[in-house]
A protein has these predicted regions:
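Membrane-helix boundary connector in multi-pass membrane proteins
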Residues: 88-108
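Hydrophobic alpha-helical segments of membrane proteins, primarily the transmembrane helices
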Residues: 8, 12, 50, 54, ...
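Transmembrane alpha-helical segments in integral membrane proteins
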Residues: 59-73
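Cytosolic juxtamembrane helix and N-cap/initiation of the first transmembrane helix
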Residues: 1-18
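Hydrophobic transmembrane helix segments
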Residues: 13-58
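Membrane-water interface at the C-terminal end of transmembrane alpha helices
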Residues: 113-138
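Hydrophobic alpha-helical membrane segments
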Residues: 55-58, 73-94, 114-115
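Structural signal for membrane-spanning alpha-helices in multi-pass inner-membrane proteins
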Residues: 64-67, 90-93, 119, 123
C-alpha cells in the first residue's frame, strides 16, 4: 500500500478514535448517571471545548490535508510536527484520564496511542525519504 494512503488512513483512525473515546465517555447517560464536568468558570469551559475541538478534529484534519494535497517538503515536516503533537497529547491524556476512567477506555486509549505511534513512524519515514506524492507528478 502506498505510504500516502497509509498515513491518510492513520489520520482518519485517530479522528475516529477520538469520536469513540467521546462516545464511551457519554454512555453512562443511558443509565441516568451524571457525566458533567464542573469547570471553575465559564472561560475554563470554553477553553476545554476549544482544546477538545483542536485535539480531536483540527490537528488530524490539518494532517490529512498535508498528506493528501501538499507536495512540498515543508508540508511533510509540518505533518511530522502535527503527528508529534498528537503523540504527545495521546501520551499525556491516558496518563491523566485512565486512573478514574471507565473500563472501556483502558482498551480505546492504548489502541489510539498505538495507531499514533505507527503514524509517527510512517510520517518520519516519509520525511527522511523526501518522497513526492502522486499529486506532484501531474
Amino acid at each position: 500500500m502506498e505510504r500516502q494512503v497509509r498515513v491518510s488512513i492513520l489520520w482518519l483512525v485517530l479522528m475516529v478514535g477520538g469520536l469513540v473515546h467521546t462516545v464511551v465517555e457519554v454512555m453512562p447517560l443511558f443509565w441516568g448517571e451524571s457525566i458533567a464536568a464542573m469547570p471553575q468558570n465559564e472561560a475554563q469551559m470554553h477553553g476545554m471545548m476549544a482544546f477538545s475541538a483542536c485535539f480531536f478534529f483540527v490537528l488530524p484534519g490539518l494532517g490529512q490535508l498535508c498528506t493528501l494535497y501538499a507536495c512540498k517538503r515543508w508540508c511533510a515536516v509540518l505533518n511530522a510536527v502535527l503527528a508529534g503533537v498528537m503523540l504527545l497529547l495521546n501520551t499525556s491524556h491516558p496518563i491523566m484520564d485512565l486512573p478514574g476512567a471507565l473500563l472501556a477506555q483502558w482498551f480505546i486509549l492504548p489502541l489510539v496511542f498505538l495507531f499514533n505511534v505507527i503514524l509517527m513512524v510512517e510520517v518520519v519515514k516519509a520525511c527522511r525519504r523526501k518522497e513526492t506524492h502522486s499529486c506532484c507528478a501531474a
